[in-house]
């Protein structure tokens, strides 16, 4: 959630920055609500003060033997007016809060202005795409020749479209990838491995920004009742990991907090009908190793560079060509202030495809979660800055290996970094 000060003290500039990312802030409507808030807040305070004064006068009048009935009636009337004003103010604040919940984060000044992915800016490339001397197959056809290692037909029978059953060496390779990623991030990059619930409540989804705006993208498994909140399957481990700090005040000495987790992720892919219908690229259920950092405000942009670099290391160790892209204002996620995408080369598509998205959220999520740390200089709690990124999407990494490492005889070479995780197996044979 945006800092209310941005909307109260500099709404025109805030609207301009939001427009750069395609969001139209109704300045007139918000300004009108803000004026009403000021008026009601002032009236509520005046009524409170007046009632306090009158209440004190009752005691004095009673001590002097005066008739206090008129004063009691007056205080009672003021109390009724105060209750009405408080109720009206509460309703107005709820309206303002609802409006504010739908406003995305402000883009950082270093983010290029643009409408969509066509306006993203390439920062760098690593590795050279391989030149093949045979006809390249996509990952679906490659896996079909490897004991039908990616079985979409059976998954469709079991569940429906956009699911997969993995078997044999492909399933082992998928598991090896997740283990390799976790080991790299915990042993080389200083992250703490976490195991988290795959079901979360509405407060958690609100904290990281999925609710209320993106509820249709989620799988909801349990509706809210009088006894408690509903539960939804996690769309990313970012949700449970980041929400660990919800309603907490961390010791500054513990920062930065760096966490990683391997989880399945569940997304309805609402709005993606007809896109990437073949293969693993866009599934309802997919595995991902997530990276989350909780840092001091002054450290967040350096942390973004570091976190992105940690994801890059995985691609480099796997010897997969990729490029690093800075997203434009119109292509960033709802809560992001600045985002880098890492896109891996897929020879069957003859293009780069997203395999990781790394974002600095500033205090946008922390304000929603009330995730804070105690500043040792002021001894007062301040909002944390939160960052997250994929390190990496396991399924898409599997796709990249199957396509980039395929051989003319239908086999696939195992990346050297994964051989120890495959019990020494260097080739997956057809």
Curated annotation (Swiss-Prot):
NCBIfam families: serS (TIGR00414). Its main location: cytoplasm. It catalyses: tRNA(Ser) + L-serine + ATP = L-seryl-tRNA(Ser) + AMP + diphosphate + H(+); tRNA(Sec) + L-serine + ATP = L-seryl-tRNA(Sec) + AMP + diphosphate + H(+). Catalyzes the attachment of serine to tRNA(Ser). Is also able to aminoacylate tRNA(Sec) with serine, to form the misacylated tRNA L-seryl-tRNA(Sec), which will be further converted into selenocysteinyl-tRNA(Sec). It is an enzyme of class 6 (ligase). CDD domains: SerRS_core. Consists of two distinct domains, a catalytic core and a N-terminal extension that is involved in tRNA binding. This is Serine--tRNA ligase. ATP binds at residues 267-269, 354-357. GO terms for molecular function: ATP binding; serine-tRNA ligase activity. InterPro entries: aa-tRNA-synt_IIb (IPR002314), aa-tRNA-synth_II (IPR006195), aa-tRNA-synth_II/BPL/LPL (IPR045864), Ser-tRNA-ligase_type_1 (IPR002317), Ser-tRNA-synth_1_N (IPR015866), SerRS_1_N_sf (IPR042103), SerRS_core (IPR033729), tRNA-bd_arm (IPR010978).
